[in-house]
């Protein structure tokens, strides 16, 4: 029987905290037209300007969260890869990153050399965005075409509303919800509004809506923000959260363009003003902890919240290699994968 490999795909990380490694990683990341959607000359100019100061700043941030084993994102992704192996009897389980190492091209070439002809991609992004899902799948297509690999590829679609994913979220978060707290903030990664407007053509689509109830199926399939709201609403219902004891925000905005709101940094100040003293924060757009969760929220966000008058901010770990997540990912990868 032909083996079917499972390829876990995530965003990536610098090789180290050295400034030159961070610069190389940021250059690859920001020059992706799905990330910075400007014509090449303007994109090259903008990225060159960003790379004057940003690598040193980011290297300092990475140094604050780097583990002895390496990048937390890579280490945790490797743990997930190992945990998945007993749950995927169809063939090898591999890991690749869209930027940095292990590179998609290297992993696919290695699979082809080993005689693997079928691959199931598992992009580890619950919600759809061109800057995550699409660019990863396009890179897989490019590599297969460039090297004429002849691989039969299927891919796991976004799983923001899948019951097994939501149940895994609830199970992983429940111990923290049982601790004394005033509020739970679900902080998703942000996205420039124009990225959504390019995909959702309906001019009536509301990018400030407080919930996803009135979103059409066509818009929901393409709107990252609406999918985040749908995840948050379904999670809150499953977890039995009281209305008013939880809220949604969007983090990690870059540059001067308008990004989807509300912004996490503004929300932290707002919650303090509302009297929230003990805050829990979870980041459901990430399945593995990384610089955006550990440093941006767990360190800078916590410092901001306490400086504004809060007592404590507790960052809830991502799904990482939680057993419930491992089982959910294996089930979804086998049941939902469709031709690429």
Curated annotation (Swiss-Prot):
PANTHER family: FERROCHELATASE, FERROCHELATASE, MITOCHONDRIAL
HAMAP family linked to this entry: Ferrochelatase
Catalytic reaction list: heme b + 2 H(+) = protoporphyrin IX + Fe(2+)
The enzyme's E.C. designation: 4.98.1.1
Name of the protein this chain belongs to: Ferrochelatase
Species classification: Bacteria, Pseudomonadati, Pseudomonadota, Gammaproteobacteria, Pseudomonadales
Pathway given in the UniProt record: Porphyrin-containing compound metabolism; protoheme biosynthesis; protoheme from protoporphyrin-IX: step 1/1
InterPro entries in alphabetical order: Ferrochelatase, Ferrochelatase_C, Ferrochelatase_N
